Amino acid sequence: MLFEMTPETFKKVNSSNRIIKGLQYTPLASSIPLENGLQNVLYPSSKFQNEPLQLNSEESSIMQRYVDMLNPGATFVNDSETFNFYKNALSAMITEPAMPAMRVNASPVLDQKVCNSDSLSELNDFTKSLIQPSMLMCEPKEKPDASSINTNRSSSDNGFLTPSSSPRSPSCSRVFNAVQLCSPKKSKDDITTPKKRLMEDTYSPRESPSKIQRLQDVLLKQLQDTRLLISQVIEAENSEDFSSNSLFIKREDDDGKHISSHAIEKLYMALTKLSRLGACDKLLEEGSIILVKQILEKELKELPVACYSIINLHDSLTQFPNLDFILKTTALVLFIIFLVPSFKKLQNEESILHLLNILHSIFEYTVPEAIDNIVQSKTSDARTSEIQHLSVLLQKVANVLNILSKVAHEIPLSEAVVIRIVYLFPKVSTLDNSFKTKLPNCNSSSFDFLKAPLFQTLQYLFRLYPYQRDFIIEESLTNFSHLPTARSVSRTYRLSNGKSIQYYSTLFVRLIQSCSIQNLFDSEIVQSESKSTEALHSGNLTEHLKTVESILSKSRHEEYRIANHIVAYLLSRSLKQNKTESDNSFAILTKILLEDLLNMLSLPEWCGTETIIRQFAMNLVMTVTNDKQAVSSKNAALDLISLIVNKVLALFDLSLFEKHNIPAPTNFNDIISFIPSITRLNELSQVSFNHFYFLCKGDISLENILPYNYNKWFSFLLQLRKVCNDSEALKIIDNCIDKNMQKSQEGFQGPSPFKADENDEDIFIISLYHSSLFLNLKFFVSLIIGFLDSPQASLRTKCLRIINQMKTIPSILRTHPEVLAQIISKSNDQSAIVRDTVLDLLGTYIMAYRETIPQIYGCIISGISDPSTIVRKRAIKQLCEVYEATEDLNIRVDIASKLLTRSNDEEETISELSLEVLEKLWFSPASNELDCQKGYEQLTFLEKQKLRVQYFPILKLCAEPSTERHVLLVTSLKTMLTSKEEINLSTLHTQIRLLLSCLFNQLIEVVTEDQVDESTKGILYEIMSTLFVFSRAFPFLFDLSYLHLLKPYLRSASTIEEQRFLYYVVAIFRQVLPFQKEISESFLRSLESVLLQRLTKAGTATLMEIVPCLCSLFTRLNDYERLKKIVVSCLKSLEEARHSENNFQKMVRLIDLIGLFSRYGDLNRINDDWKHSLDFISPECDDAYVILLGYFQKLLKDAKGQLRIHIIDNMSRICLRETSLFISPLMLSTLDMIIAENNVNEVSVLFKSFLELLAADEDLIFEADQKLSLKGKQNVQSNKSVDRDMLKGTKDKQWIEGVSASLMQHFLPCILDSCFSKNLRYSMLGIEILKCIIHQGLVNPRMCFSTIIALESNAIKETREVAILLHTELHRRHESLIDGLYAQSADLIFSLQKTEEYQTFKLGEFSPFQSAYTIVSADKSSKSRKKLIMQILKPLKLDGIDLPSFTEEKVSFVSFCCVCLAGIPYVSIEEPLMIISTVDSVLATIGPTITGWMKKLDHERFKILAGINLCNLIYLKRYIKYAFSISDSSRPIREKKPLTLLNRGYVDLITSDAKPDIVSKLVIKLFEEENILSGEDQVEGEQLTVV
């Protein structure tokens, strides 16, 4: 089986009349004859254009026309003339088919009562002789479903039947049925009264005419009426006085007589009635009917061209010959040509050509004028009226085309007539396209009335005239390019499966089906049934079948030739059109056609579709395997192949074999595997053929369906016979062949074999499985997979996308691990689109086979760190699906960890997506499927376990002892909180509360365990770390009961693990306590006591949590005296320790305590005399913070090493509490001293305090922006997040006081210098401060811009990214301020990169201004780019005055600017031309002077340096010209597309240490080669261009 795929089983609608219904959906013109002007067109009773037509009451009344006209007449035939009439009429009725002009639902079947001997005894002798013996032995049959017969029946028999078959139209049955429609004769038992019974006995049977006799009278009367009408017309034509005759009229514009519209209608109706009774050539005189035809043709030839104008459509029919008269006359002439056989022999070419010229004139003048009238209509009512008139006109023209199609089917036509008919097709298509283009909103179904008969005519011509096939195909393809590309406008034809396609697509399939042989065995090959049977038993079947195979082969080759002609024409044009081109209509039309063909593939009525699709596939395969084809053509071809492959895979359904009891082949890629199932397939084929015959008989438009399917099946049998080597299997195949030959000779008769619960489409789909299209399916799939290793990234991407679209791709990858490994290897492809498609494909695979997650998961998770944004997005989405699908907790933890790292991605969309996915996986109610209204205690045991499994990854992430991880978690959780609206916020709060309840219940369970082992400690640590993280993010969701549970864990700690545990507990209390409004004083006192006990032995991190918590307790208990005692006690102890030795650790702890209590405690609220309390340190004022700051300054003078750093750190803490102290003289002098000493560690401490100060300002700005954005909204978000001011120990708005701006402006030089430090941590602190400065606008951006540009070329990636972001922000907000600073930036970069005296420069190296150029180019303004380049060109613009001042450093700087200019990837060619023009002007100015010095061998130092500079400028010019392919002639070409450097090699510039002799020779040589004209001799306006 193909890749062992699991095909999809389709639910199909069962219907026994799919073929006829499928061909009924497009509305056709009514074939009822014209009668009453505009009222003669019968509109379908359905209101919708794409529904099957139904007969209305008027049509039904016309069907009963002959029954209503029955009149009693003579009871027997006694004259020879009448006898000959009946003989001819009834003979024609038995052998000739019914005319299609009258639409009937079904052919009536003989009733058993009519066929008995009593009824037959009423016939006269000649009538009995005309009836076939088979009609006398008829048996009752089931009446077929009326809906299964096409409403557009035609007159031709099925060409697949031999002359010995049953009659093509049951005319005798119609005779008997017409008699039956009269009231039946009553028996004597049915007569109720004796008087009536007596009257019945007295009357003779001859006195009451029988039903047959009455019908014979009707036939005679119809013949007499027709002859009389024809004679009246001829006599009126020859008579001069016609005033009393209504058949001819006189026009106002001339004195001649003209046949009236009334006469034409009567002739049409009379001939129609008579044609249904028999052959008109035997019933009418040939000379009379020829005269009538000549009269009509004369009328048409005398009509002026003005008659074709649409304005005459509303005139009176009796006053002027209008379009209605023209169309009626044309239809009648064509009808006469169709009815009279003599015209068939004569091939009256002149008459038909004249009629065709009339149709051409209508399409050239009338219809375009009608469309223009609609377009020019000023009101909607007028437009509606015009559209209705156009619809009426087109339906009348369609009636003429219907008759023309019958003529084309029955009458041999000359080449000129065929060509003229074919030329009608482009005109109709042009008008249809014009209507849809000018009136896109109007219903264009009226033109479908024209297409239906026209397509049928082309189908007949295509079959009957093989030499004209190429001409018909060329015309069809030429008009294909003019079709509308909008699917909603073009797809107006609805198939039987309900899908809409464009009408044009059906034409190609009709033409292909017309190539098939109609009667394979109706020739000299098989003379009779006995001979074929004799050949089978005599062993001559092989030779006999060779001839049959040769005929079939020629037929199939013709089909393939025509199909290949169509496909080659379409693909040769469509594959050349690029999607980016403005006019890619042909490519779109080709794709629409292929989609339509694929929709028709499974429908039996369009059996020729498979041939065209096969040729499509083969041509596309040749395109993609041709190395000479362009990549764009291969991409387009792969797109089309994917459509074919996906459709074929969708149709592959193994359940059909089981449904119809067929042995399924073992290998669908080998035709031999179908041999075991050939018997059953042959039986179903015979059933299918009977079904086709039943549905298509009598309709010439469907005459190709049965022969095409039969020939295809017989060809398959012959192909099997050739490859079969088993004698037993060969006998089975020969038996099937013999049965098919016999069936063809006997004819396919009988009712439809399908019942309501069966599907006639199944057998046809099964027959497709052994077609070449399905047999090559594996090859198509293998071909697509082969492009995984294509060198073109676009082809690899296309291949992966096609594979991903295949519905059976998971099973293919499952059974072919080598293909899976090939796809996985593309996860490291250079193309981001390829990597993205690989992740999508692997995600589809592991979702289908979840057991493969551990093997494939690693490839997907690597994509989350991909440099491409689209790949990271795809990886995040795929990981979300894997997280939900897997039960492996370790994988879930890993996924959550990777998603968390992406929450601070540099791309904002990635960060938002990561947080969205994490929130969905952790806190979405749908993730745990629990009732959110329930509390944790109300959950069942299984629900609790499920909840713990869901929160397991959160615990594992929080348990990592990493500050960065905790900060990332808290930031992510806060972002989830602040990004929610009020409605969604409550849901998130509910989920968090459920998580906290779960954690604290686990905490209780762990504590109550008897033994505490290492695993229990680990669980306890995970729980506490998780509570710590959530206390920072959601402190307001903690209950007071949780604090009571946590208090026992405030125990002393001796080990590192215990210290960390204590740190978590204290931090939770610090965050949660401010949000507990109702809490007992006893609990607070107890908590205060415990924290004071842990204060002395707490670690540094724990101390920084305990002190803020204690300060919060002091404020809550109003216990400021305790705070004062602690501070005073620490100061006294510190004063004592400073005079002692070996007390470093004690002093550090005391200094930290003083600094922390000063920052988080409000010392100003202590009502006491600080000067008196701290008299031991001799304070100079009464302000506690100033006293402490002065004391620390004294300590700083004598401190060294780490103690000095601690003092500076705590001085900064005091200033952070009272920010105005930062700019106090005391603190500023201290800061200046620290900065002057330039100790990196000490300055880093200051920078950290600056960052904290700026972060507070940043938060205030953020809160102000949030309030501004939420202003005016109804659901204003409540700010229940952490109190940032409390955490920072201040509530003052320092940004109002200007402290931040003053500090940053004062220390800006130091901050900018720190950005270039080799100490990475120190430089990153400076860059972070610079980022805050720019964002808050604390200094003029011009002061920082040069530093930012220099940082863009930094070796550290993080530094470069920050610099690029800052430059982008400044360019967007302050472009006018920074435009003139690029030259200054170049000077700074040069000074930073200068490492040696004689530095070497190479053209083509990375330009420090490449990132700056990219940022400036983003706004697509050439003005900004030119300003940047002109700034860098400034140092190159030299004149004679500058030459004496040349130094080595200046030469190096100019060389550096040359490197900067050469390494930029310019967007426009104008920019390299600007550089060349500047260099030329400099060479023309100073070149002759310098060259003169070199020729004189003047080796003065500044002259040699000037020569070196001149050579470097020439090198730059040559490099630019070569890199961008620029010549010295013609005008410049302005290119809008980005240019690619053709030369990425390096060109060494001359350094300052070059020898004077070499420099002199080189200057002279280069300058003479440049041929620069100096001064006034320079040609003005000389420009360059791209080669």
UniProtKB/Swiss-Prot annotation:
Region of interest (Disordered), ranges: 140-172
The keyword Ribosomal protein appears for this protein: no
This protein's encoding gene: mis4
GO molecular function: ATPase activator activity; chromatin binding; cohesin loader activity; double-stranded DNA binding; single-stranded DNA binding
Organism: Schizosaccharomyces pombe (strain 972 / ATCC 24843)
Protein function: Plays a structural role in chromatin. Chromatid cohesion molecule required for equal sister chromatid separation in anaphase. May form a stable link between chromatids in S phase that is split rather than removed in anaphase. Also required for spindle-kinetochore interaction in early mitosis and inhibit sister chromatid separation until the cleavage of Rad21 in anaphase.
Subunit structure: Interacts with ssl3.
Domain of life: Eukaryota
Chain positions found as Phosphoserine: 183
HEAT repeat locations: 775-812, 814-851, 853-888, 890-927, 1101-1140, 1183-1220
InterPro entries reported in the protein's UniProt record: ARM-like (IPR011989), ARM-type_fold (IPR016024), Cohesin_HEAT (IPR026003), Nipped-B_C (IPR024986), Scc2/Nipped-B (IPR033031)
Protein name as catalogued: Sister chromatid cohesion protein mis4
